[in-house]
């Protein structure tokens, strides 16, 4: 790889090869040219720490989401619409595991870098980005339907969950396939190392800007607007009705929104600012670039951690997962206690 740790190298734009190595959302911004002046170089996370953090997130992701997926498959006949959507979120987080695994392998073994591996890594990353947020939107929609039509049975059926999950998956597949079209293996003209880069010929800069713009609009602004709409509608319905589970519904709304804003919102805001900077809609400077790119490096790790931890938290919102996970932990506890006494 051209960057072996979270390095942010800023060079002049006029006669340089503008580059941002977006590996699973971890932005390594650098502009390569034979005659350039370096503005600033900031080390955010050392190489060994970087690999260790990604590996830890990978393990937590696989174990946690694998456990939830196992519980669903074992008791899928009892699943409702929310449970189907939560399963989609867990499986989607496993997609990020594939991207993280490919990224770590390319860090450790640069010789294996190929166009196919580059496209695989970025495809599963964008699939995670789009499918995750649209799945959360679908969860908010089902929550609204369950509250607004609490006397009806159709919002609880599996068929609604499968329809919404399929729709979110279709949108994510189209957007992810578009994002990885020009991803390929190239050689850094300075370090002579292989790396993954969007290679669209003379249109490379425009293409990269297009990908980032679509990511900001379709992966953040539109879903955020839908989240606000559905949870606002749910809140209004809860306030004007006398639901027995009124306090519980409010708690779910606060929990889901709070988790999204803590783990994902900072990265998306910085990604939006970075896109505006590249479009020259805000004033460009080395200081501004430094702040944005350091922030992107840190918040992208937070977003990756979200994929590993939040599905387990979301599992508590679905009755199937909550009851079965509680039963599983009780069985493990009893087995441990009986083994300790013998």
Curated annotation (Swiss-Prot):
Lineage of origin: Viruses, Duplodnaviria, Heunggongvirae, Peploviricota, Herviviricetes
PROSITE patterns, sorted: G_PROTEIN_RECEP_F1_2
Q: Where are the transmembrane segments?
A: 52-72, 93-113, 122-142, 160-180, 218-238, 252-272, 294-314
- Which keywords fit this entry according to its UniProt record? G-protein coupled receptor, Glycoprotein, Host cell membrane, Host membrane, Membrane, Receptor, Transducer, Transmembrane, Transmembrane helix
List the protein's name.
viral G-protein coupled receptor
Quaternary arrangement and interactors, per the entry? Interacts with protein K7; this interaction promotes vGPCR proteasomal degradation. Interacts with host CADM1; this interaction is essential for chronic NF-kappa-B activation.
| Extracellular-facing ranges | 1-51, 114-121, 181-217, 273-293
Q: Which residues lie on this side of the membrane: Cytoplasmic?
A: 73-92, 143-159, 239-251, 315-342
């Amino acid at each position: 790889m051209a960057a072996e740790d979270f390095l942010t190298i800023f060079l002049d734009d006029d006669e340089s090869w503008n580059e941002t190595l977006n590996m699973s959302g971890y932005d390594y911004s650098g502009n390569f040219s034979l005659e350039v002046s370096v503005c600033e170089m900031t080390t955010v996370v050392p190489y060994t720490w970087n690999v260790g953090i990604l590996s830890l997130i990978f393990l937590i992701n696989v174990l946690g989401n694998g456990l939830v997926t196992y519980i669903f498959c074992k008791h899928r006949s009892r699943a409702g619409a929310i449970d189907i959507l939560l399963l989609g979120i867990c499986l989607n987080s496993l997609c990020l595991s594939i991207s993280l695994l490919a990224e770590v392998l390319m860090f450790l073994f640069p010789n294996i870098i190929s166009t196919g591996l580059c496209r695989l890594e970025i495809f599963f990353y964008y699939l995670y980005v789009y499918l995750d947020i649209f799945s959360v939107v679908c969860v908010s929609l089902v929550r609204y339907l369950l509250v607004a039509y609490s006397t009806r049975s159709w919002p609880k059926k599996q068929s609604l969950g499968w329809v919404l999950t399929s729709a979110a998956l279709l949108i994510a597949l189209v957007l992810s396939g578009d994002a990885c079209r020009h991803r390929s293996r190239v050689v850094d003209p300075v370090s002579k190392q292989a790396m993954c880069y969007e290679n669209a010929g003379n249109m490379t800069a425009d293409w990269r800007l297009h990908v980032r713009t679509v990511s900001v609009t379709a992966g953040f602004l539109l879903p955020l607007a839908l989240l606000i709409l559905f949870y606002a509608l749910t809140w209004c319905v809860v306030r004007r009705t006398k639901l027995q589970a009124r306090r519980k519904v409010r708690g779910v709304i606060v929990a889901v929104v709070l988790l999204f804003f803590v783990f994902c919102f900072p990265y998306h805001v910085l990604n939006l600012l970075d896109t505006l900077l590249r479009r020259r809609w805000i004033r460009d400077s080395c200081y501004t670039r430094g702040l944005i790119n350091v922030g992107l490096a840190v918040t992208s790790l937070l977003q990756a951690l979200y994929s590993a931890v939040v599905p387990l938290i979301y599992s508590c919102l679905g009755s199937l997962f909550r009851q079965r996970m509680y039963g599983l932990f009780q069985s493990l506890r009893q087995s441990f206690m009986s083994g300790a006494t013998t």
